[in-house]
Amino acid sequence: MASEIFGIAAVFWVLIPVGLAGGALLLKLQGD
């Protein structure tokens, strides 16, 4: 069970920054 929790945490640690960066990029592109 612990390994599953760590796996999910690792996925979120990767997806959250990527999602924030992608959202910022889209806002910049729309602004231009």
From Swiss-Prot:
Covalent S-S links between cysteines: none
Record membrane topology: Single-pass membrane protein
GO cellular component: cytochrome b6f complex; plasma membrane-derived thylakoid membrane
UniProt xrefs under InterPro entries: PetM_cyt_b6/f_cplx_su7
Keywords, comma-separated and alphabetical: Electron transport, Membrane, Photosynthesis, Thylakoid, Transmembrane, Transmembrane helix, Transport
Gene Ontology MF term list: electron transfer activity
Cellular compartments annotated: Cellular thylakoid membrane
Ranges in a coiled coil: none
Gene Ontology BP, a term: photosynthesis
Functional note: Component of the cytochrome b6-f complex, which mediates electron transfer between photosystem II (PSII) and photosystem I (PSI), cyclic electron flow around PSI, and state transitions.
Subunit structure: The 4 large subunits of the cytochrome b6-f complex are cytochrome b6, subunit IV (17 kDa polypeptide, PetD), cytochrome f and the Rieske protein, while the 4 small subunits are PetG, PetL, PetM and PetN. The complex functions as a dimer.
Protein family membership: Belongs to the PetM family.
Record protein name field: Cytochrome b6-f complex subunit 7
Organism: Prochlorococcus marinus (strain MIT 9313)
Gene for this chain: petM
